[in-house]
Amino acid sequence: SGGQTLIPTLKARLGMPTSLVDLSGIAEMSGITSNGDSVTIGGAVTHHAVNTSSDVPPALAALAGGIGDPAVRHRGTIGGSVANNDPSACYPSACLGLGATIHASGGDIAADDFFQGMFDTALGEGQIVTGVTFPVPAKANYQKFVQPASRFALVGVFVSQMADGYVRVAVTGASESGVFRWTDAENALASDFSADAVPAAPRADGMISDLHGSAAYRAHLVA
């Protein structure tokens, strides 16, 4: 899972798994279905397929279209990205930002419970992500500042508003703890769903600081 992370790791000999299993041939994990209120995407569906499907909400489709390059988008899958939970991956922010349900081989897991830190999830040993169900929002948008070489998010923010007015804001690429919900922004946007209502940048404490940007810089980009 997470080939955009896994392949560079293998090339650098930072990881040496004894076995690699290809899940792309499992037909039950390869479809996209919609019932109007939600859309379910199989774990083996590629980023390209998500990007080009008319059943996928526009914000999620646009997110998928901005992942990696064409080679990555035609091979990489939503299930692999979600299971890998790279701290700079885009899909985790959509899962949290839309209140998705992760379908695993061991059962269903709410996105709020699934992502537990950098490269850490609620998946049990030997479990895989078989699909993800996303509620269809009334409004949503995803914006990211891109690391030019990898196309990962230096910082990415997914914002949604449901038909009942409920707002979720999720941030990827910024925190040492991985993807997180920005509750201050959620509370502000719940009262006034406009750019003017977005609060000042979150605290830089706990933000990633590396060669791509300091913690303070990432906090600034979030807002």
Please describe what each predicted stretch is.
Residues 1-223:
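C-terminal structural segment of proteins
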